Amino acid sequence: MTAMLTLETMASEEEYGPRNCVVCGDRATGYHFHALTCEGCKGFFRRTVSKTIGPICPFAGRCEVSKAQRRHCPACRLQKCLNVGMRKDMILSAEALALRRARQAQRRAEKASLQLNQQQKELVQILLGAHTRHVGPMFDQFVQFKPPAYLFMHHRPFQPRGPVLPLLTHFADINTFMVQQIIKFTKDLPLFRSLTMEDQISLLKGAAVEILHISLNTTFCLQTENFFCGPLCYKMEDAVHAGFQYEFLESILHFHKNLKGLHLQEPEYVLMAATALFSPDRPGVTQREEIDQLQEEMALILNNHIMEQQSRLQSRFLYAKLMGLLADLRSINNAYSYELQRLEELSAMTPLLGEICS
């Protein structure tokens, strides 16, 4: 719809000359949220109007809003956006936005060849190689981090749970280990290393927990709803015993059941993780355009791989479902930070995880 309106704007410019943003007077690019605006005011309105606490004008709402002055007073700029008819209800939720992007990428992919080109195949192999070296084998190594005896499969379900401290210590150790392996995985990717160190850190802090759960899903059993890591068996009850809130764990279980039910192949898991990694909207990111292009490339390869490998019936909505699950992971990621702050003992044991979730 936006593209169509932008084309209409271009056509009207040829007939009537350039049209200006009704908020600041800059050149308008189309109708955004029900008003003819520039890209700057469109982005400002999306970022600002949904905040719980809005900006306050120190000059009683009398500031001029123009192209030159629009950044000086966010409160007056926001009020003018509302006065000219921009509507909050037209802003898509994170999930709806992810699904729209998924549909857009799917349409682009359908126009392009569904066969991966040589460069894309090589990129998939690089991702798989890094995943095989650092992430795939890490679950079998959990046993080296002093697990309580009742976590061993041959003890379950008979062995009663022991005191919580050994379990918390084990959880802290394996979470730190997983984050370390995910860092090694990303550092093994030339595209990731090509970014500035500041952006590498910002992307890792934003995506580490999401990549962790995408990878952990490979150990999840849909029938028992347990995670099997080498000789160890983890149940959601173990996390409850350690102090995690039941509602938080329910959202994690829901995610893993939905993802496991899609029966992904290893390349699809890895490409999903790469799509999460290269997210240009993480806090602190500076090279947004470059990272956005990287994410679009990963998403396009993921969609083409699905269309190439899966049956037509199975693949029809798979890509859109994966994009929706990535949106769910954002919510889990945010909730994980709060849980870590609440569990002070676990937080104290995992400084690396605390830094990632800060």
From Swiss-Prot:
Primary location group: nucleus
UniProt entry tagged with the keyword Phosphoprotein: yes
Domain of life: Eukaryota
One term of GO molecular function: nuclear receptor activity
Impact noted for substituting L346F: Dramatic increase in binding NCOA2. Little effect on binding of coactivator NCOA2 in the presence of TCPOBOP
ZnF segments: NR C4-type: 21-41, 57-81
UniProt-listed Pfam families: Hormone_recep (PF00104), zf-C4 (PF00105)
InterPro entries linked to this entry: NHR-like_dom_sf, Nucl_hrmn_rcpt_lig-bd, Nuclear_hormone_rcpt_NR1, Nuclear_hrmn_rcpt, ThyrH_rcpt, Znf_hrmn_rcpt, Znf_NHR/GATA
Alphabetic keyword roster: Activator, Cytoplasm, Cytoskeleton, DNA-binding, Metal-binding, Nucleus, Phosphoprotein, Receptor, Transcription, Transcription regulation, Zinc, Zinc-finger
Effect of F227W: Diminished binding of coactivator NCOA2 in the presence of TCPOBOP
Tissue: Predominantly expressed in liver.
Post-translational modification: Phosphorylated at Thr-48 by PKC, dephosphorylation of Thr-48 is required for nuclear translocation and activation.
Stated consequence of mutating L216F: Diminished binding of coactivator NCOA2 in the presence of TCPOBOP
Outcome recorded upon mutating Y234A: No effect on binding of coactivator NCOA2 in the presence of TCPOBOP
Result of altering N175F: Diminished binding of coactivator NCOA2 in the presence of TCPOBOP
Gene Ontology BP terms: negative regulation of DNA-templated transcription; osteoblast differentiation; regulation of DNA-templated transcription
Compartments, as annotated in UniProt: Nucleus; Cytoplasm; Cytoplasm, Cytoskeleton
Domain NR LBD, chain residue ranges per copy: 119-358
Modified residues (Phosphothreonine): T48
Record text about domains: Composed by a short N-terminal domain followed by the DNA binding, hinge, and ligand binding/dimerization domains.
Family assignment from sequence similarity: Belongs to the nuclear hormone receptor family. NR1 subfamily.
Described function: Binds and transactivates the retinoic acid response elements that control expression of the retinoic acid receptor beta 2 and alcohol dehydrogenase 3 genes. Transactivates both the phenobarbital responsive element module of the human CYP2B6 gene and the CYP3A4 xenobiotic response element.
Subunit details: Heterodimer of NR1I3 and RXR. Interacts with PSMC4. Interacts with ECT2. Directly interacts with DNAJC7; this complex may also include HSP90. Interacts with CRY1. Interacts with CRY2 in a ligand-dependent manner.
Name of this chain's protein: Nuclear receptor subfamily 1 group I member 3
Lineage, broadest ranks: Eukaryota, Metazoa, Chordata, Craniata, Vertebrata
